[in-house]
A protein has these predicted regions:
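Catalytic alpha/beta active-site cores
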Residues: 1-99, 128, 158, 164-168, ...
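Mobile "lid/hinge" segments at catalytic clefts and subdomain interfaces of large enzymes
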Residues: 40-73, 148-226
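A glycine-rich phosphate-binding loop feature that marks nucleotide/adenosyl-phosphate handling sites
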Residues: 47-53, 86-97, 126-136, 169-176, ...
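Short glycine/threonine-rich loop-to-helix capping motif typified by GTGT followed
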Residues: 58-62, 97-109, 134-148, 175-185, ...
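Glycine-rich anion/phosphate-binding loop at the beta-strand->alpha-helix junction
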Residues: 66-69, 93-177, 181-185
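Intrinsic disorder at enzyme termini
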Residues: 163, 199, 224-313, 319
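ATP-dependent carboxylate/acyl-activation modules
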Residues: 273, 280-343, 399, 404-405, ...
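Short acidic low-complexity segments
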Residues: 344-352
Length: 427
């Protein structure tokens, strides 16, 4: 594969459709851009990468790329142009994804889908497929971990058949990659190409039952979405609306419930880490989304209330046995995602923290809650959490003064939902 690590975008090509779908260009402007592109030489880009940036499913991204390819052919046919030369100018652009196997299968499915589309039109062209490193998986906290994500995503795209890859740098989530980030991206690309020789073997995933099945599933789902769009709006707007409706709750649920681990953000956060300033979040249809953004924003808000100091949460330990250590570590990790430094105190002790959490066994939770509430409130705590599963006693414990419960089922949701309240009363 040809790697282009220092480019922020693939080589200039005609690519008018994403701007229209995102509401940045009118139908008249898009039509004029299409007319100009068809009359000039150069590649015609069938772009699905913006869907990956917005967190759409792999099938939706593939369907949008197919829709763009079909729009180019339909526009050329409407103008009486020969379709074979136009098809020869088509190039696909797909985004990388955080899942190695889904990304690999997506690029394999793309080749099958575009070949099927052109074959049905009686065309023999074989379009090139490009990959763009997307920022949806990148973090502003612990940005060095993005180097691992970048390498995994690039590997998946190459093994899936991408013929060129544009890398953006590990700190590109700030809006502009630094020279150092571009240098490291170049190094990663060179290692994958010159030392790992990933682009030498054609379709190395061929024969893997799991990957063959996943490729077929993605191709089938994408083709069904593409056909549905052709029966409707035909321009991709239906796919964008569907993708937006699905991706927002998917992002929120995956992160807040910690079903998707983000190293350095939701798992193993470093309290000494300084985040790079994030780019301003976009809005509108198919707006780019980053998985880590809600947690990073909540942590930044908490830290802003205590400049020069670290906010503290007091963990009231009600069971000194070693069996409780995993629960204490779990609570520490949850609060650390919002920038809190946890201190352990015996149950009933005074502390200067405005946030407190009871850490005890489920069997002792109801019994020890009154002593915890009395001690925490007398110390000035405004928000009282309990780590554990209260079962049927949840309602009565909350009526007594517990703000919420922290466990595997709730994940980060109680803390993120109350981030504004926590920051307003943090001292």
């Amino acid at each position: 594969a040809e790697l282009a690590p220092i480019a922020h975008r693939v080589k200039p090509t005609a690519n008018p459709f994403p701007a229209q779908l995102r509401g940045h260009a009118s139908a008249q402007q898009t039509a004029a851009a299409v007319e100009a592109a068809l009359q000039s030489p150069g590649a015609l880009l069938a772009d699905g990468s913006f869907a990956a940036e917005a967190g759409f499913s792999e099938a939706t991204e593939l369907a949008l790329a197919l829709t763009a390819a079909a729009r180019w052919l339909q526009a050329a046919d409407a103008r009486g142009l020969a379709l074979e030369p136009v098809a020869a100018r088509l190039e696909l652009l797909l985004g990388t994804g955080r899942d190695l196997f889904f990304t690999l299968a997506k690029f394999r499915a793309a080749r099958l889908l575009i070949a099927s589309l052109l074959d049905r039109a009686g065309l023999t062209a074989v379009p090139r497929i490009h990959a763009l490193e997307t920022l949806s998986s990148k973090t502003t906290l612990a940005p060095w971990t993005n180097l691992i994500r970048l390498s995994v995503e690039t590997t998946a795209a190459i093994l899936g058949g991408a013929q060129s890859i544009a890398l953006r740098g590990h700190d590109a989530a700030s809006g502009t990659a630094s020279p150092e980030a571009l240098r490291l991206a170049l190094g990663a690309a060179c290692i994958l190409r010159e030392e790992s020789h990933l682009g030498v073997v054609a379709d190395p995933a061929q024969g893997s039952a799991a990957l063959e099945q996943l490729t077929e599933q993605l191709a089938t789902a994408a083709w069904a979405l593409f056909q549905e769009e052709q029966r409707g709006a035909k321009d991709g707007s239906g796919l964008v609306a569907k993708g937006d409706a699905e991706s927002a709750p998917k992002f929120a649920d995956a992160v807040t419930r910690r079903r998707e681990s983000i190293i350095g953000v939701t798992e193993f956060p470093d309290l000494g880490e300084r985040a790079v300033a994030p780019a301003a979040p976009a809005s509108g249809p198919a707006a780019p989304r980053r998985w880590s953004q809600p947690v990073e924003a909540a942590r930044a808000a908490v830290e802003a209330t205590t400049p020069g100091a670290r906010p503290i949460v007091a963990l009231h330990v009600g069971d000194p046995s070693e069996k409780l250590r995993p629960r204490i570590a779990f609570a520490k990790g949850l609060f650390a995602t919002l920038g809190y430094r946890a201190i352990e105190v015996p149950l009933g002790s005074d502390s200067a923290a405005t946030v407190a959490c009871l850490c005890t066994s489920d069997a002792l939770l109801a019994e020890q809650t009154p002593a915890f509430i009395e001690a925490a409130k007398s110390a000035g705590a405004h928000h009282l959490f309990a780590a554990g599963n209260p079962g049927d006693a949840a309602a009565s414990l909350q009526a007594a003064g517990i703000t919420d419960f922290l466990n595997l089922a709730t994940g980060l949701a109680p803390l993120l939902q109350r981030a504004a309240q926590l920051t307003s009363e943090t001292k």
